Amino acid sequence: MVSLEDAVIARLESHGERFEVLVDPDLAAEFRREDSDVSVEDVLAVQEVFRDARKGDKASEEAMRKVFETADPLEVTPVILRRGTIQLTAEQRRQMIEDKRLKIINKIAREAINPQNGLPHPPKRIEKAMEEARVHVDPFKTVDEQVNIVLKAIRTKIPIKFEKVRVAIKIPGERAGSAYGVISNFGKITNEEWQNDGSWIAVVEIPGGLQDSFYQKLSELTGGNVETRLIK
């Protein structure tokens, strides 16, 4: 649940009445998506419907029943979020855009590669390409909704594409147990087997941009006792 300090106002005016709720701006934007599984309880900072949230004036039950046919905040809030507007101060909007921009950059850095050499782009290079391409970030759209649009825009500045790579790994048996969960978090284990010498080998499919961090983590987990090979 978002704190009152970080909450923003979602507002709906209908039938001559005004209704406001205090919400988490990111979760409110996510909630408005048709396929969202975000709960209304998580979106709300406080389970109250206001006539004027800044003054703390609550909406009357009579007004809510007239417009929504219910006075339950958990039933009223979804209607306000989907039909109303989310109010942001200039600073809140700036911060939301900056946060969303960084999330987009990090996702692209994790999942994209330079097709010319198969290596990931550093986040700073992606950030610079976005600036040069004059990319607009929408604070109310999710990262997934915007990332392909951004990728298309920055392709005019740098060679880049989303691609998964397959990596073959071999780890001593005594290290396999602790490494398995970490490896699974990086990507999908498509093949695995135990060798006669007790070692564990596997083929893992990971986002291309994660190669460096994947190899580094494997080295840390095994004390450097790991073999890897990029499968073309």
UniProtKB/Swiss-Prot annotation:
Superkingdom in the source lineage: Archaea
Coiled-coil features, chain-numbered ranges: none
GO biological process, alphabetically ordered: cytosolic ribosome assembly
PROSITE patterns: UPF0023
InterPro entries linked to this entry: EFG_III/V, Ribosome_mat_SBDS_CS, Ribosome_mat_SBDS_N_sf, Sdo1/SBDS, Sdo1/SBDS-like, SDO1/SBDS_C, SDO1/SBDS_central, Sdo1/SBDS_central_sf
Entry's transmembrane regions: none
Sequence similarity: Belongs to the SDO1/SBDS family.
Name this protein carries in UniProt: Ribosome maturation protein SDO1 homolog
